[in-house]
Amino acid sequence: MKLEVFVPRAAHGDKMGSDLEGAGSSDVPSPLSAAGDDSLGSDGDCAANSPAAGSGAGDLEGGGGERNSSGGPSAQDGPEATDDSRTQASAAGPCAGGVGGGEGARSKPYTRRPKPPYSYIALIAMAIRDSAGGRLTLAEINEYLMGKFPFFRGSYTGWRNSVRHNLSLNDCFVKVLRDPSRPWGKDNYWMLNPNSEYTFADGVFRRRRKRLSHRTTVSASGLRPEEAPPGPAGTPQPAPAARSSPIARSPARQEERSSPASKFSSSFAIDSILSKPFRSRRDGDSALGVQLPWGAAPCPPLRAYPALLPAAPGGALLPLCAYGASEPTLLASRGTEVQPAAPLLLAPLSTAAPAKPFRGPETAGAAHLYCPLRLPTALQAAAACGPGPHLSYPVETLLA
């Protein structure tokens, strides 16, 4: 008779019971193995199919004892297997949750609507101009933009900071305090600066003042020759010179001639030099002669200098040629005749007899300008002696 069958079973860690079971016959079934391995399965199946943590722990303990009795692993492997099963279950849980969260995020993709083709300055100005009182708060400006443009209705809210920054950093917007005692309040009004109308000129909203172009200055200076008002009836209009001359056909040259003072007003500027018509030497001589009219009265007597002739109250006179004018009659009142054929070096005005002129270069038909000349001692002696021989050197050397 085998007594080990009726011995009460000890705990899992009892080594004596396990030895007795190993020493006895293995044909006798254990009372704890009635359910068998078919109902419990492996450790992983036990952890997955257990209805509760407590019941699962009890089953695991029973399974560990059964394995010990059937010659399986020792009782110390039971807690390790339980920990492994719990680790697998906890690892499987986050993975399943992550997969579900990813599917939920993919179901709501972020779609950003196209941004309106205006700057924030333009958008804010449009909102303020469309208002009834010409001023809006920051919240009202945001509501206006959200109602008019779909871009501002999405989940993106960074544009609100852009609106606030543009309001405070640009001079074209002025803050109007709702309560002067609370300047730090956030419910103040914003309106357009009346001194910054250039920013919103022509319906275009600019950040900086528009530069004055050359065409605007030309149109503001006056009408062009083609746009001149018509004359009275029956008066034929002369053809403009710009059509006949090939140089004036270019629009750039016309603009430069029409407004020479827009770039540089000096007479030495390139535009002012090019704007003057070309004149030949003959034309310039005739114009110079016209600009030098002679007076009817003679020149007043000049003050005598010690270096001049001692007897000459007005000193000696040197003719300076000026083309295109008639001979002045400076000595007509004193009865002295002047030869107009050549430049003369006249004697003192007080002498009754005319002095013999000194011959110079032939300038027939030329007029002369008379000015006092400081003569050297040789010429003073020659003039005092009266008529004398011709000088061997030209008069031009005296002017040098």
Curated annotation (Swiss-Prot):
UniProt GO BP: hair follicle morphogenesis; negative regulation of transcription by RNA polymerase II
GO cellular component: nucleus
DNA-binding region positions on the chain: 115-210
Subcellular location: Nucleus
Biased composition (Gly residues): 55-66, 95-104
Transmembrane helix listed as a keyword: no
Biological role stated in the UniProt entry: Plays a role in hair follicle differentiation.
Protein name: Forkhead box protein Q1
Gene name linked to the record: Foxq1
